[in-house]
Amino acid sequence: MSEKHPGPLVVEGKLTDAERMKLESNYLRGTIAEDLNDGLTGGFKGDNFLLIRFHGMYQQDDRDIRAERAEQKLEPRHAMLLRCRLPGGVITTKQWQAIDKFAGENTIYGSIRLTNRQTFQFHGILKKNVKPVHQMLHSVGLDALATANDMNRNVLCTSNPYESQLHAEAYEWAKKISEHLLPRTRAYAEIWLDQEKVATTDEEPILGQTYLPRKFKTTVVIPPQNDIDLHANDMNFVAIAENGKLVGFNLLVGGGLSIEHGNKKTYARTASEFGYLPLEHTLAVAEAVVTTQRDWGNRTDRKNAKTKYTLERVGVETFKAEVERRAGIKFEPIRPYEFTGRGDRIGWVKGIDDNWHLTLFIENGRILDYPGRPLKTGLLEIAKIHKGDFRITANQNLIIAGVPESEKAKIEKIAKESGLMNAVTPQRENSMACVSFPTCPLAMAEAERFLPSFIDNIDNLMAKHGVSDEHIVMRVTGCPNGCGRAMLAEVGLVGKAPGRYNLHLSGNRIGTRIPRMYKENITEPEILASLDELIGRWAKEREAGEGFGDFTVRAGIIRPVLDPARDLWD
């Protein structure tokens, strides 16, 4: 089969039940409004269980007590996760004070969870508090629309505090893309904000009546930082600047990390370069990519429905030509760009506008008052006096942005007293985990609760081999859906069963190579034994500046993944 047209443009066959649900939902209304009044269950029933995802929520339960409740003949302790729409991760201090209050007063866990989708989540919202949370968000100019399910999700943007003008321009585009691709249905406003039903019929000119075949993720990235991990995303706009001013974007399409254990029809994939476009075509191109995936994506198999599979089926050139046709443009050749890193610069950084930016390391993004480390209270105190904004990073950290010289000492004092500036190793700064147990229904192994002590052990190995000043990009994800982005790490652990993980090696520091499975279904002691040996070899045999992942490839420890659609599972 030629690249020109290797497979059918549209997959024929029986549609998945999710397609029926969307079609019958009356533009995402379902019977959610009626279900809210059903006090007999703490959860949502039937289609509503899935429909609430379009409104930014997932129904979960506390898995630590699930078996115990079942023995007592009680339903699981249902509660919702809510994910806010926050393009580019920028949040005002007024908004922060509102979400702090809600988390403390109206959630089971009392925490704010920063996520690597550059936003925050509330975990443990009981059904009676579901409508109030949407109304609270609306009252401060926020919403949770389209942060889950088959839509364009929260749009990421590089958290680059140094080049303030470039960041401001890129951030504006992240917001514009997010707004342009939002669903037009009034269901969200009617159900949560009590807005009147209007007589006009709903229309979805971009997303269509059955929305997208699967989730869709978009980024705006400013080289040389790849902090947003562009290759985990469907559509990526790489900022191209001239004289410090944004002039256009390189477009990369078809990244994604989710796989299914043992299912070789699934694979992680890096995004393909389509070409360069000047700024004025940005929204037309974004819409064209989304509508092409809307029409060509596989609606008969949700495990094969993402953009990465569409590209592999129809061919990159065919998909690209269709985007050009729909947008009415021709891509120019890719402009040069390179990445040098993807971690956050923890601590104070001076921007070109003479303001300072303080990046705080938040382990696993979990903001709570811990004994001796009142992180949540500390951030609230800063929010009360800070005149700039907060920025959530795609590494689950938080930037106190735009601090004038005169305010620096005051903010630093609060941060230090609250444990927000405690010294951590470079290794801990470059490690990340998804939430997993106890709230995630898909979790197979621990991630967030496992990572801190696991990194203690890794730090000990790094010290033993004399490389404590170095780091390895290390990530843990509780299941192969891959929210922890382990499939772009130098060392990635993918949960297989309680206490067991698949160990992936051979990714690189800048996040442009998918790691291959090195060992399957192993325990923490087995993982540490493997890494002890390999870190020891890296410390002795590496070349100048050579990262751990690149070393494992050069030393022949593991073959690199060159074409993941074909060789990931070899």
UniProtKB/Swiss-Prot annotation:
Pathway: Sulfur metabolism; hydrogen sulfide biosynthesis; hydrogen sulfide from sulfite (NADPH route): step 1/1
EC top class named in words: oxidoreductase
EC number, UniProt record: 1.8.1.2
GO cellular component: sulfite reductase complex (NADPH)
Keyword Phosphoprotein among UniProt keywords: no
Listed PROSITE patterns: NIR_SIR
Residues the record lists as binding siroheme: C483
A Pfam match: NIR_SIR
Reactions mediated catalytically: hydrogen sulfide + 3 NADP(+) + 3 H2O = sulfite + 3 NADPH + 4 H(+)
Keyword Transmembrane included in the entry's annotation: no
UniProt keyword terms in alphabetical order: 4Fe-4S, Amino-acid biosynthesis, Cysteine biosynthesis, Heme, Iron, Iron-sulfur, Metal-binding, NADP, Oxidoreductase
Recorded family membership: Belongs to the nitrite and sulfite reductase 4Fe-4S domain family.
Assembly, per entry: Alpha(8)-beta(8). The alpha component is a flavoprotein, the beta component is a hemoprotein.
Designated name of the protein: Sulfite reductase [NADPH] hemoprotein beta-component
Organism encoding this protein: Escherichia coli (strain ATCC 8739 / DSM 1576 / NBRC 3972 / NCIMB 8545 / WDCM 00012 / Crooks)
Lineage: Bacteria, Pseudomonadati, Pseudomonadota, Gammaproteobacteria, Enterobacterales
